[in-house]
Regions:
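Short, basic (Lys/Arg/His-rich) helix/loop patches that form interaction surfaces
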Residues: 38-49, 59, 120-129, 133-134, ...
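C-terminal catalytic core of Y-nucleophile DNA break-rejoin enzymes
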Residues: 22, 90-118, 126-148, 154, ...
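Catalytic-site neighborhood detector that most strongly recognizes the C-terminal catalytic loop/helix
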Residues: 19, 27, 85-91, 113, ...
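Short, polar N-cap/turn motifs at the start of nucleic acid-interacting alpha helices
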Residues: 2, 73-80, 156-158, 177-200, ...
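Basic, Lys/Arg- and aromatic-enriched nucleic-acid-binding interface segment
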Residues: 4-69, 77, 122, 163-165
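Conserved tyrosine-mediated DNA breakage-rejoining catalytic core shared by Y-recombinases
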Residues: 10-17, 68-118, 191
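Feature representing long, continuous alpha-helical segments
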Residues: 34, 38, 64-67, 81, ...
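Membrane-topology and secretion signals of cell-surface/extracellular proteins
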Residues: 3-4, 45-54, 63, 78-80, ...
């Protein structure tokens, strides 16, 4: 039996203490997208690493959610990624404590689906979609993504892997086309004002599906 490099329970004892601490990550502005795509295309790195960064930008997910993704988490026909609640930051503690929480649903744009299909060919037979090129049945390490960004020429104060998620959030909000609660639901953020005791994993799924396709088209045509 193999071991995963990620300790998904790490830091649970600090959740209550750090829950109000918010860190701002450097991110791409709208006018920076085209240059990022060019640098990523020219980057001398394994294709899976490059595709991981691109897929992260297209989906707006966190690092652990991305790197712990397995083939059976995806429904290619329905174009949906079903992320286990254990992999979601906000839900992890409840799952470990025994609560039953459904998978979190991430709609996939046509572009994200194409990226996924390419990666699945390279990682066929591996446990993880974004498999380590060096270690069997292990995902690529989170630090590998930031190292790749450094190789692209971005300093620590210019862009980080998590900053791709911030890019996603910022541009969607700035577009003025989508409601805040759709974007927050896509980011798996729990609405502090909601009265329901449980989180609905399918919140605004139809709206988020349309929004994610807009985002995929936006990234494809960014110049």
């Amino acid at each position: 039996m193999g071991y995963c490099e990620f300790n998904i329970a790490h830091g649970l004892n600090k959740i209550a203490i750090n829950s109000k601490i918010k860190k701002n990550y450097p991110y791409l502005k709208a006018e920076d997208i085209s240059d990022f795509k060019y640098k990523l295309q020219k980057l001398d790195a394994h294709p899976i690493i490059k595709k991981a960064l691109l897929f992260k930008l297209h989906t707006g997910v966190r690092g652990a959610e991305l790197l712990l993704a397995e083939p059976h988490h995806f429904d290619l026909n329905e174009k949906v990624w079903k992320i286990p609640a254990l992999h979601i930051k906000q839900f992890r503690r409840k799952v470990i404590l025994g609560h039953e929480i459904p998978d979190f649903l991430v709609p996939l744009s046509d572009q994200a689906l194409d990226i996924l299909k390419d990666v699945m060919q390279w990682s066929y037979g591996e446990k993880y979609i974004f498999a380590s090129p060096r270690k069997h049945n292990q995902p690529i390490h989170f630090n590998t993504l930031n190292m790749a960004i450094r190789k692209m020429g971005y300093g620590k104060h210019q862009l980080s892997s998590h900053g791709l998620r911030s890019t996603f959030s910022t541009i969607l909000n700035d577009s003025g086309l989508f409601q805040d609660n759709w974007i927050e639901a896509q980011l798996s953020h729990i609405d502090k004002n909601r009265t329901r005791a449980s989180y609905n994993h399918a919140d605004y799924l139809a709206q988020r599906t349309e929004m994610m396709q807009w985002w995929g088209d936006y990234l494809s045509t960014a110049k």
